[in-house]
Design a protein with these regions (language model features):
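Predominantly a Rossmann-like dinucleotide-binding segment in NAD(P)-dependent oxidoreductases
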Residues: 125-208, 214, 348
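Hydrophobic residues in well-ordered beta-strands that form the structural core
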Residues: 94, 119-121, 255
Length: 353
């Protein structure tokens, strides 16, 4: 740990912002100097109640002069907030997606390079031991791959309020899809070349052109294909709401959840329960050469534990001077695929990358 903790300004106190703030609160290398939220947050955790709270981001940035700014606001504010923070001398943690457009995402990366600041994007699955195991096991199979992934959420109450708020600017396949496209890209290492998307507005009161259910296919230059689906709202089915399959000619790797997991439970979105590794090899009688393997992942970090890991990674990236070039470029690449999927939904045309 550094002798003097890094001063952090936390911007955005929604579901993710609070989790990140609690991570800074418990980390010896960070000191929260202020919180920023456009309105007075309700039910703020007791651990955060004593910190100064402001409503104006620019004024708070000038007042507190932080070493680090943590941004968990609406996606369309990410780029401007991040660039302003780095111009003021702060390192930045920003929730995914990095920005609302690919051009803005590249602008943020360019600012990190210009100001020589660290930029970490909130790809929480990169800090999850079970997901890194999934990636390792899938890579052992060799490509080309078929990716089948989704995350549908039968949301109501506060969860539906959060989803409707996000959909003022960002569709489900962009907001959630960047996580799983990032996983696909880590497994295949191939270049995505085309995206085809479809979506349906199943909920009333959505902004013009917005949809709460969507799915897309992404094609890679090694022959791999990926499918991702995301739907939010009280109408969503919980049947097969969490599919995580990677298939190749040599077998498959799948996440198998515990029965009874709820689709709107944020911990269920990252917990894996068990990983099933299936081998395709057959003997002379066309019988399996190797039995399926079950990797038990119970006891893994919960959602708060994963946020703690993310912020520890940020701390080490700053204090140990990590080269984050690949990290930043990957964030832009996964966003590019999901933005193309959103464009395909809206135009009805496949998008070449």
């Amino acid at each position: 740990m550094t002798a003097t903790p890094l001063k952090v300004l936390v911007v955005g106190l929604g579901q993710m912002g609070r989790s990140h703030a609690l991570a800074y609160h418990s980390h010896e290398g960070f000191e929260i100097v202020g919180l920023v939220n456009r309105s007075a947050p309700s039910n703020l955790p007791e651990d955060l109640a004593s910190y100064p709270l402001r409503t104006d981001y620019a004024a708070a940035l000038a007042e507190f002069k932080p070493d680090v700014v943590s941004i968990a606001t609406h996606t369309n504010t990410h780029a401007d907030y991040a660039v302003a923070a780095m111009a003021a001398g702060a390192h930045v943690f920003v929730e995914k997606p990095l920005a609302a457009t690919v051009a803005d995402a590249r602008r943020v990366v360019a600012a990190a390079e210009e100001y020589k600041r660290k930029l970490v994007v909130g790809y929480i699955l990169r800090h999850h031991p079970s997901w890194t195991t999934l990636i390792e096991q899938a890579r052992k199979l060799g490509g080309p791959y078929v990716f089948r992934m989704n995350l549908n959420q039968q949301s109501s109450g506060a969860a539906w309020d959060i989803h409707r708020s996000i959909m003022q600017t960002t569709s489900p396949i962009v907001d959630c899809g960047v996580h799983y496209v990032d996983v696909m890209c880590q497994i295949t290492d191939a270049t995505p070349v085309e995206v085809r998307g479809m979506g349906v507005p199943l909920a009333k009161g959505l902004p013009e052109g917005m949809y709460n259910y969507g799915h897309f296919q992404v094609l890679f230059d090694d022959g791999s294909v990926g499918w991702y689906e995301a739907g939010w709202g009280p109408m969503m089915s919980e049947t097969a709401f969490f599919v995580k399959d990677v298939i190749s000619a040599n077998g498959s790797v799948s996440i198998v959840m515990d029965q009874g997991a709820a689709s709107a439970d944020i911990n269920a979105h990252t917990q894996t329960s068990r990983i099933l590794v299936h081998h395709a090899g057959l003997d002379a009688d066309n019988k399996p050469l190797k039995a399926d393997e079950w990797l038990d992942m119970h006891g893994e970090p919960d959602h708060q534990g994963l946020c703690d890991r993310e912020q520890d990674y940020l701390y080490r990236a700053i204090t140990e001077d990590y080269d984050l070039t690949r990290h930043m470029n990957d964030a832009v690449a996964s966003l590019n695929i999901c933005i193309a999927a959103d464009e395909s939904v809206r135009t009805g045309q496949a998008v070449k990358l």
